[in-house]
């Protein structure tokens, strides 16, 4: 199950988040591995504006009451290693978007201005409701542009050492998206291999494929052939050569359970007990292995 977007009431700060440059300098050997203690911010900035596209007449866009002012407010963006946060500065609330909920991101250029285009899966806070039946997944289109710089007193301290622009947001989002696996996409495409991310050991027996046995291996009731295996009592047939084994087979007329081991030039350590030997007398001397 993929994580869902959620409403948050606290924006990232220097206590729980560090910029990517600081993280790389402090622990380069763990680069690209999620930190257990703090979030890692790959990109971000303040003074952005979000527009919601409503160009499709077959879709009705609905916005949660907490985010009705999103299109008319200045927002701050945090591209973290775990999610993207859209923070509304005026109402001090934010929307946390997991990367699995962002189906597409792209750069748009209009004259000298750049914009970040996002396709977000419909959720409890921003949704697109089809007015007629459709087979496509419902998404909401967002356009993010750089509007203006806000007063330094209102700027989050995390942005002080970071260049804030649309291109940086796109690069950070693309990098972090690659860290998050979307298992639902493989299930929809029929490519559920239960690999590294989807291993389920409890169901390994029930999900195991059936063993295909050639029909020629299975005899029906009218052609049962019981093969009798005669046990001549010599479990240790190492002393029997091929001629002696063949003679026993010919005399008995049935297959003999024997073992012929070719040990090459290596010597066998210990001794082999024969049937005629006294078990009690030879107990301490037989089969002494090193």
Swiss-Prot record:
Q: Which UniProt keywords apply?
A: Cytoplasm, Nucleus
Q: Would you kindly state one Gene Ontology biological process term found in this protein's UniProt entry?
A: mRNA cis splicing, via spliceosome
Q: Name one GO cellular component term.
A: pICln-Sm protein complex
- Specify whether Nucleus is a keyword of the entry: yes
**Primary localisation category:** cytoplasm
* Cellular compartments annotated: Cytoplasm; Nucleus
The UniProt family comment states:
Belongs to the LOT5 family.
Question: What is this protein identified as?
Answer: Protein LOT5
């Amino acid at each position: 199950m993929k994580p869902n977007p959620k409403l948050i009431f606290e924006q990232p700060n220097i206590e729980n988040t560090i910029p990517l440059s600081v993280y790389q300098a402090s622990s380069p050997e763990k680069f690209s591995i999620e930190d257990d203690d703090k979030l890692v911010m790959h990109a971000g900035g303040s003074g952005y504006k979000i527009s919601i596209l409503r160009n499709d007449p077959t879709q009705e866009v609905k916005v949660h009451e907490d985010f009705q002012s999103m299109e008319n407010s200045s927002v701050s963006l945090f591209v973290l290693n775990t999610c993207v946060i859209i923070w509304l500065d005026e109402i001090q609330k934010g929307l946390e978007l997991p990367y699995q909920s962002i189906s597409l991101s792209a750069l748009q250029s209009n004259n000298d201005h750049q914009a970040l285009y996002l396709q977000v899966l419909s959720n409890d806070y921003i949704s697109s409701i089809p007015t007629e039946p459709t087979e496509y997944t419902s998404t909401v289109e967002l356009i993010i542009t750089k509007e203006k710089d806000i007063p330094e007193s209102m700027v989050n301290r995390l942005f002080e050492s970071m260049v804030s622009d649309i291109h940086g947001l796109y690069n950070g989002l693309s990098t972090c998206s690659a860290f998050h696996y979307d298992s639902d996409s493989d299930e929809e495409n029929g490519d559920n291999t239960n690999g590294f991310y989807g291993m389920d050991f409890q169901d390994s027996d029930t999900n195991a494929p059936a063993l295909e046995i050639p029909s020629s291996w299975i005899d029906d009731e009218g052609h049962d052939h019981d093969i009798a295996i005669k046990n001549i009592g010599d479990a240790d047939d190492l002393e029997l050569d091929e001629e002696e084994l063949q003679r026993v087979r010919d005399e008995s007329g049935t297959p003999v359970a024997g073992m012929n081991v070719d040990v090459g030039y290596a010597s066998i350590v210990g001794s082999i007990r024969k049937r005629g030997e006294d078990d009690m007398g030879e107990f301490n001397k037989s089969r002494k292995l090193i």
